[in-house]
Amino acid sequence: MVIVMEIYEGKAKKVIPLDDGKVIIEFKDDATAFNGKKKAQFKGKGWLNAQISAILFKVLEEKGIKTHFIGVAGDNKLIVEKLKMYPVEVVVRNVIAGSLKKRLPLKEGTELSEPIVELYYKNDDLGDPMINHYHAKVLGVSERELKEIENIALKVNNILKEYFAQRGIILVDFKLEFGKNERGEIILGDEISPDTCRFWDAETKESLDKDVFRFDKGELINAYEELYKRLTA
């Protein structure tokens, strides 16, 4: 495997393409919040996010969800299948929290009777605005693709809700990204980590995710380590 070039460096990851249809995702120790207005570094965060993502991708693969995950390529690196990513993020919400509490007249922590699926346009300059199917189709995502993406997202939710519940964790909400592989299959990509999910302790409702950093709730690394411990116990 030969590195071709570094094609992308985001706020929390580097994406490095190889010459064999694979990609390395390198998780950084950087943490950002509020569209990059709040920044910090936490030693070990990249390792934790890589390991947690690997665990969760394996869980999903075992349940029949196709993901881009191939293996762990180092302490803070994953090797994954190269995908052509959709310009849309999918957010699945099970509990009133985050931005949803500003849009619905319900108390934070209220469990939803059924999950809410939201779409967002991946564009930092525009602040990743919420969109609907009509907007997504303008961006080149067909109705058939949208339905398949949303169906996969709901299956992921069912699998992970049960998985985390067994470990004393509430899966409040989470973000997914999808792409197409060379065979034209829609595949789950990106990461599944406390950077992209909202996790609460089932008893105390304490955050085990980036909200700890975002809202100064404590030590981010302690929260991520606690999550990792529960996944590996």
UniProtKB/Swiss-Prot annotation:
<dbReference type="InterPro" id="IPR018236">
    <property type="entry name" value="SAICAR_synthetase_CS"/>
</dbReference>
<dbReference type="GO" id="GO:0006189">
    <property type="term" value="P:'de novo' IMP biosynthetic process"/>
</dbReference>
<comment type="pathway">
    <text>Purine metabolism; IMP biosynthesis via de novo pathway; 5-amino-1-(5-phospho-D-ribosyl)imidazole-4-carboxamide from 5-amino-1-(5-phospho-D-ribosyl)imidazole-4-carboxylate: step 1/2.</text>
</comment>
<protein>
    <recommendedName>
        <fullName>Phosphoribosylaminoimidazole-succinocarboxamide synthase</fullName>
        <ecNumber>6.3.2.6</ecNumber>
    </recommendedName>
</protein>
<keyword id="KW-0658">Purine biosynthesis</keyword>
<dbReference type="GO" id="GO:0004639">
    <property type="term" value="F:phosphoribosylaminoimidazolesuccinocarboxamide synthase activity"/>
</dbReference>
<dbReference type="InterPro" id="IPR050089">
    <property type="entry name" value="SAICAR_synthetase"/>
</dbReference>
<keyword id="KW-0436">Ligase</keyword>
<dbReference type="GO" id="GO:0009236">
    <property type="term" value="P:cobalamin biosynthetic process"/>
</dbReference>
<keyword id="KW-0067">ATP-binding</keyword>
<dbReference type="InterPro" id="IPR033934">
    <property type="entry name" value="SAICAR_synt_PurC"/>
</dbReference>
<keyword id="KW-0547">Nucleotide-binding</keyword>
<comment type="similarity">
    <text>Belongs to the SAICAR synthetase family.</text>
</comment>
<dbReference type="InterPro" id="IPR001636">
    <property type="entry name" value="SAICAR_synth"/>
</dbReference>
<dbReference type="InterPro" id="IPR028923">
    <property type="entry name" value="SAICAR_synt/ADE2_N"/>
</dbReference>
<dbReference type="Pfam" id="PF01259">
    <property type="entry name" value="SAICAR_synt"/>
</dbReference>
<dbReference type="GO" id="GO:0005524">
    <property type="term" value="F:ATP binding"/>
</dbReference>
